[in-house]
Amino acid sequence: MLKVEDIKKAVSKFGKQYGIKNAYLFGSYAKGVANEKSDVDIIIEKGNLQTYKAYSGLLYSLEDELGTSVDLLTMDGVKPRFFELIKNDRILLYGA
């Protein structure tokens, strides 16, 4: 099973390459309740990541690096209510 530090390293590796501004971990890994079947939930502020091709490239790069499924969301792609539900449990992976 992955550690938060492993996820942070993977996101940092690709963050600059894909031009993301900030990335946060949420869900089971952020809450410390992940198991072998858990995917990795990440929400990003896109920064320079503006095309679907770039988004897909980042997603596939993270999945390859981590060896597991990644649920990659963007801040502007989720409703404010959803963000309110996750903001207290999120962990900064990359950015400010």
What are these regions (language model features)?
Residues S28:
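Conserved H-loop
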Residues M1-N22, K31-E36, G47-A96:
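Catalytic core of pol beta-like nucleotidyltransferases
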Residues L25:
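Conserved histidines in hydrophobic membrane contexts and catalytic metal-binding motifs
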